[in-house]
Amino acid sequence: PIAGSMVLAAILLKLGGYGIIRMMQILPMTKTDVFLPFIILALWGAILANLTCLQQTDLKSLIAYSSISHMGLVVAAIMIQTPWGLSGAMALMIAHGFTSSALFCLANTTYERTHTRILILTRGFHNILPMTSTWWLLANLMNMATPPTLNFTSELLIMSTLFNWCPTTIILLGLSMLITASYSLHMFLSTQMGPTLLNNQTEPTHSREHLLMALHLVPLMMISMKPELII
């Protein structure tokens, strides 16, 4: 069920990050070097999840692995124990909550019309449902953290924190962001561009679907314009 996926990606996945933040406040102040294995594992896990995204053919699996990779960055940022890292982690959790939920919602609208989640079989939607393609484009741009979105602000804060702690981490972060951009564009091009493979008549999009997407992306854009609300 799509509602379960949306709640899981938007709220439940963030509870782990919230739990780590709360535990960090309870524990006595420790040197960041103690958390070095966890930081390296989180960054390496983010890259592996991103690489897994590149070889996915199932739309929902791709979005799910994308969520996992972003949570790796959140864990690494929290473990650094700096105000910037904490702000970046909180901002990324909120931004990615909106984005991943919107992507799952879009995946469901596509599935309801094609009855398949295979990327290559859902192509050509920009000719049939141009407004839905616009929502796909906006959601993917937010997922790959293009400015001026909150995703970009949060990833910039996390990148600054990790670079300040250890300059070598910029290699892992840069690689992670490059792969994120690659699979986000691949997902958009695979589902929207090219000739359509549908022979039957496609049902038009409903107002409730557009309202649902607007309620995901408009608040995110508004927070992006005034990030002081959460940072």
UniProtKB/Swiss-Prot annotation:
Gene Ontology biological process terms in this record: ATP synthesis coupled electron transport; electron transport coupled proton transport
Q: Where in the cell is it found?
A: Mitochondrion membrane
Q: Where are the transmembrane segments?
A: 1-21, 34-54, 61-80, 84-106, 118-138, 169-189
Transport among keywords: yes
Keyword Transmembrane helix among record annotations = yes
Q: Which reaction does it catalyse?
A: a ubiquinone + NADH + 5 H(+)(in) = a ubiquinol + NAD(+) + 4 H(+)(out)
What EC number(s) are associated with this protein in UniProt?
Answer: 7.1.1.2
* Keyword set, alphabetical order: Electron transport, Membrane, Mitochondrion, NAD, Respiratory chain, Translocase, Transmembrane, Transmembrane helix, Transport, Ubiquinone
**According to its record, how does it sit in the membrane?**
Multi-pass membrane protein
Q: Which GO terms describe its molecular function?
A: NADH dehydrogenase (ubiquinone) activity; ubiquinone binding
Judging by the UniProt lineage, the source's domain of life is Eukaryota
List, alphabetically, the GO terms of the cellular component aspect.
mitochondrial membrane
| Family as reported in the entry's similarity comment | Belongs to the complex I subunit 4 family.
> What does this protein's UniProt record list under function?
Core subunit of the mitochondrial membrane respiratory chain NADH dehydrogenase (Complex I) that is believed to belong to the minimal assembly required for catalysis. Complex I functions in the transfer of electrons from NADH to the respiratory chain. The immediate electron acceptor for the enzyme is believed to be ubiquinone.
Q: What is this protein called?
A: NADH-ubiquinone oxidoreductase chain 4
Q: Which organism is it from?
A: Porthidium nasutum
The lineage, from the top, is: Eukaryota, Metazoa, Chordata, Craniata, Vertebrata
Gene (name only): MT-ND4
